[in-house]
């Protein structure tokens, strides 16, 4: 098995991340839109929001409102994130003591990506996500505004022009503080939980296959299943811990003049609505994050595995 970071080109990771991000964004846009609508007002409920959209004109189109900015944000955001994460993880693995021994011990594993310590997984995941989030923040602001029913934007150009005219360039980075505080811990915790879960499930699956007399090498379907289950579990834990920051971020991006910055928003939300408002949209976010993260990571790892396999075949023929 490859170490992933060494044999696969950074282009593989960029395009694998791009494809996995686009697919998950398109499939799960309705959940993202519902989360935004529920978080924008204390009076909104999930059922009421679904009923309101479904009874309105063009319900199917309305559920996928904002798909273009979501696809741009998630697609290119995932591409930047995965390629940055791979570069950081590969660099960290080169400097880790006992790397060769660690790789040998982890030979029967559902992933071909570099194996790092828990601290390194936490740090690289957090840094890569913050960097990708900063680059994609203008698209994120456009996405949230476009999904909300507080604004009557007819196009992304109209939304961009209005934000720039009323708020200036800083308007495109509204909520970045809350986003970074949410995304950095989430991404770090996700990579940490994801890698731990994969390691344990891979070890368990290998023992089961050895007991049954099958090959000790995990099959493609088994590896994909392990990666998907690990992604769901990691997303659920990370999402629950970081949801308050997501709720704060959404309020700032939708109503910057009312909520100002992260500290002001936190105080105002708590004083006016209590602790519960920080967990608005948690159920939708867990469901969406669990599926989107698991889908994106499983597809990403499978594309990388296939790219490496193809590369090895080509190199063997040369």
From Swiss-Prot:
Subcellular locations according to the entry: Mitochondrion inner membrane
Solcar repeat positions: 8-91, 116-200, 222-306
GO biological-process terms attached to the record: glycine import into mitochondrion; heme biosynthetic process
Similarity comment text for this entry: Belongs to the mitochondrial carrier (TC 2.A.29) family. SLC25A38 subfamily.
Keywords for the protein's UniProt record, in alphabetical order: Membrane, Mitochondrion, Mitochondrion inner membrane, Repeat, Transmembrane, Transmembrane helix, Transport
InterPro entries cross-referenced by the UniProt entry: Hem25/SLC25A38, Mitochondrial_sb/sol_carrier, Mt_carrier_dom_sf
Membrane topology: Multi-pass membrane protein
Chief localization: mitochondrion
Protein's recorded name: Mitochondrial glycine transporter
GO cellular component: mitochondrial inner membrane
Organism for this UniProt entry: Pyrenophora tritici-repentis (strain Pt-1C-BFP) (Wheat tan spot fungus)
Top-level taxon of origin: Eukaryota
Function in brief: Mitochondrial glycine transporter that imports glycine into the mitochondrial matrix. Plays an important role in providing glycine for the first enzymatic step in heme biosynthesis, the condensation of glycine with succinyl-CoA to produce 5-aminolevulinate (ALA) in the mitochondrial matrix.
Gene3D superfamilies xrefs: Mitochondrial carrier domain (1.50.40.10)
Transmembrane segments: 14-39, 66-92, 122-147, 175-198, 226-252, 281-299
GO terms of molecular function: glycine transmembrane transporter activity
Catalytic activity: glycine(in) = glycine(out)
């Amino acid at each position: 098995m490859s170490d992933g970071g060494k044999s696969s080109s950074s282009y593989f990771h960029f395009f694998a991340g791009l494809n996995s991000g686009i697919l998950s964004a398109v499939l799960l846009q309705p959940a993202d839109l519902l989360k935004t609508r529920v978080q924008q007002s204390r009076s909104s409920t999930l059922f009421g929001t679904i009923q309101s959209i479904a009874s309105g004109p063009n319900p199917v189109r309305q559920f996928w409102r904002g798909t273009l900015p979501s696809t741009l944000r998630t697609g290119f955001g995932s591409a930047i994130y995965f390629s940055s994460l791979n570069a950081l993880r590969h660099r960290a693995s080169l400097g880790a003591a006992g790397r060769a021994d660690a790789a040998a011990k982890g030979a029967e594993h559902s992933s071909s990506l570099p194996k790092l310590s828990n601290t390194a997984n936490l740090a690289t995941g957090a840094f890569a996500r913050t960097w990708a989030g900063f680059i994609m923040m203008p698209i994120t602001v456009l996405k949230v505004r476009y999904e909300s029913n507080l604004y009557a934007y007819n196009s992304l150009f109209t939304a961009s022009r209005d934000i720039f005219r009323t708020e200036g360039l800083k308007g495109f980075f509204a909520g970045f503080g809350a986003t970074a505080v949410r995304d950095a811990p989430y991404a770090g915790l996700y990579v940490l939980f994801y890698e731990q879960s994969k390691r344990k499930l891979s070890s368990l699956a290998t023992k089961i296959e050895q007991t049954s007399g099958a090959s000790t090498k995990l099959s493609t379907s088994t590896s994909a299943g392990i990666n998907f289950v690990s992604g769901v579990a990691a997303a659920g834990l990370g999402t629950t811990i970081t949801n308050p920051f997501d709720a704060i971020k959404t309020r700032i991006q939708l109503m910057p003049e009312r909520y100002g910055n992260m500290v002001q928003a936190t105080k105002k939300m708590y004083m006016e609505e209590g602790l519960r408002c920080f967990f608005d949209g948690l159920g939708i976010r867990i469901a969406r994050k669990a599926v989107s993260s698991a889908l994106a990571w499983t597809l990403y790892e499978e594309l990388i595995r296939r790219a490496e396999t193809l590369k090895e075949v080509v190199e063997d023929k040369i």
